[in-house]
């Protein structure tokens, strides 16, 4: 089977020509943001990974916390809300 990712379409290359360009672009933006490593609100290391729908765990300190469905927090002010204003 041929490689399904290209530089332009990224992980949505697995869909091929299906579903239309607009939907694949939206999925691409969410998946890139979802799969990157996020900053831990407890130890501030860049080691947070998504375990399940809305559940995240820091690989460094081991803390588990909840967040949004696809990424732990949308904006920086939500990150500080998790930290308790610190």
From Swiss-Prot:
InterPro entries: Ribosomal_eL37/eL43, Ribosomal_eL43, Ribosomal_protein_eL43, Ribosomal_zn-bd. GO terms for molecular function: large ribosomal subunit rRNA binding; structural constituent of ribosome; zinc ion binding. A zinc finger (C4-type) spans 40-61. Binds 1 zinc ion per subunit. Its cofactor is Zn(2+). The keyword Chaperone does not apply. One of its GO terms (cellular component) is ribonucleoprotein complex. Zn(2+) binds at residues 40, 43, 58, 61. The keyword Endoplasmic reticulum does not apply. Pfam families: Ribosomal_L37ae. One of its GO terms (biological process) is translation. Keywords: Metal-binding, Ribonucleoprotein, Ribosomal protein, RNA-binding, rRNA-binding, Zinc, Zinc-finger. Part of the 50S ribosomal subunit. Belongs to the eukaryotic ribosomal protein eL43 family. Putative zinc-binding subfamily. Binds to the 23S rRNA. This is Large ribosomal subunit protein eL43. The gene is rpl37ae.
């Amino acid at each position: 089977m041929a490689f399904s990712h290209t530089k332009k379409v990224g992980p949505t290359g697995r869909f091929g020509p299906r579903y239309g360009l607009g939907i694949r672009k939206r999925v691409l933006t969410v998946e890139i943001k979802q799969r990157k490593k996020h900053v831990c609100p407890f130890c501030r290391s860049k080691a947070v990974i998504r375990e399940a729908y809305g559940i995240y765990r820091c690989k460094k300190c081991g803390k588990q916390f909840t967040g949004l469905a696809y990424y732990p927090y949308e904006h920086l002010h939500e990150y500080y809300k998790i930290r308790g204003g610190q």
